[in-house]
């Protein structure tokens, strides 16, 4: 009986040692991360995994006689991702469990955006620029845009999303993608990028079109938001290209702003379409936003004028 118990103890210890050794060597062959399980999950995704998540889907209906229907757009995906990251930052100290739920969704949507980005290279001023850009997988007949069109507002939103993912995780991979995204604003629209040179009084100005084409409608609100988000990225990272693009964007806003003045109202684009109430309200907020950012009185002037 005593011999039996001794045997059982020795067997138990032997098995325990085997488990420890096996676990040590198997574990040593796997990447070790100090981050929380949510971040580990996205660093080690399992191929062919089906995620049961809600994707933001936009219903466009029929535009100019063309049925667009339901579409998953990079613009609305990045908007939803940003909301998740903001929730994560707000809750991570007060409610870590709930915060991780938002982090997981934000990272999932960010990874989706990365998977949908097109990586391209264009020659600009005898230099090759590699960039990523997001496209819309449907026609947009309102501005005669073919399937595969792109826009600066969407691009800047994806840029902001990538930076938030980097801020939340510290993963340099997201910052690297953000740097590729900013490069698209250095490449002319004609070469697949999001830079349009707009001429006024024989001078050249940078414009980042919300609806990119060789002859864009020059929508004001999208250009302002894109410029400010580019500047935000530049200020947070020190990216010299972003800071330069921001400076040029502000110069263009100030130059062309009077052309969008309809008296007591504002124009949506350079084609003379008056804003609806939603975009009129947005223009006023943007004037206040620009004034607070720059201290330039011209923005306060238009805020007060359009507010009356």
Swiss-Prot record:
Transmembrane segments: none annotated. GO terms for biological process: carbohydrate metabolic process; heparan sulfate proteoglycan biosynthetic process. The keyword NADP does not apply. Pfam families: C5-epim_C (PF06662). GO terms for molecular function: heparosan-N-sulfate-glucuronate 5-epimerase activity. InterPro entries: 6-hairpin_glycosidase_sf (IPR008928), C5-epim_C (IPR010598), C5-epimerase (IPR039721). Residues 1-28 form the signal peptide. Keywords: Signal. This is Uncharacterized protein MJ1128. It comes from Methanocaldococcus jannaschii (strain ATCC 43067 / DSM 2661 / JAL-1 / JCM 10045 / NBRC 100440).
């Amino acid at each position: 009986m005593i011999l039996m118990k001794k045997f059982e103890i020795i067997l138990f210890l032997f098995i325990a040692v085997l488990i420890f050794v096996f676990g040590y060597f198997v574990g040593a062959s796997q990447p070790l991360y100090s981050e929380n399980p949510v971040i580990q999950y996205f660093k080690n995704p399992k191929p062919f995994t089906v995620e049961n998540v809600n994707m933001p889907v936009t219903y466009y209906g029929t535009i100019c006689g063309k049925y667009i229907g339901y579409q998953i757009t990079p613009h609305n995906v990045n908007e939803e991702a940003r909301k998740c990251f903001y929730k994560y930052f707000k809750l991570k100290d007060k409610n870590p469990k709930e915060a991780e739920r938002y982090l997981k969704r934000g990272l999932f949507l960010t990874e989706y955006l990365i998977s949908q980005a097109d990586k391209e290279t264009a020659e600009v001023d005898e230099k090759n620029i590699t960039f990523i850009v997001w496209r819309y997988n449907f026609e947009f007949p309102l501005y005669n845009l073919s399937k595969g069109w792109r826009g600066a507002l969407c691009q800047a939103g994806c840029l902001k999303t990538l930076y938030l993912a980097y801020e939340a995780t510290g993963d340099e991979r997201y910052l690297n993608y953000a740097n590729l995204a900013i490069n698209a604003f250095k490449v002319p629209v004609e070469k697949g990028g999001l830079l349009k040179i707009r001429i006024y009084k024989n001078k050249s100005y940078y414009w980042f079109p919300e609806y990119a084409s060789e002859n864009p409608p020059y929508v004001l609100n999208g250009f302002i938001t894109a410029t400010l988000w580019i500047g935000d990225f530049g200020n947070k990272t020190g990216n010299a290209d972003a800071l330069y693009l921001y400076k040029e964007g502000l110069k263009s806003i100030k130059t062309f702003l009077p052309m969008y003045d309809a008296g007591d109202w504002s124009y949506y684009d350079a084609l003379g379409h008056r804003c609806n109430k939603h975009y009129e309200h947005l223009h006023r907020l943007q004037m206040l936003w620009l004034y607070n950012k720059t201290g330039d009185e011209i923005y306060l002037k238009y805020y007060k004028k359009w507010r009356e």
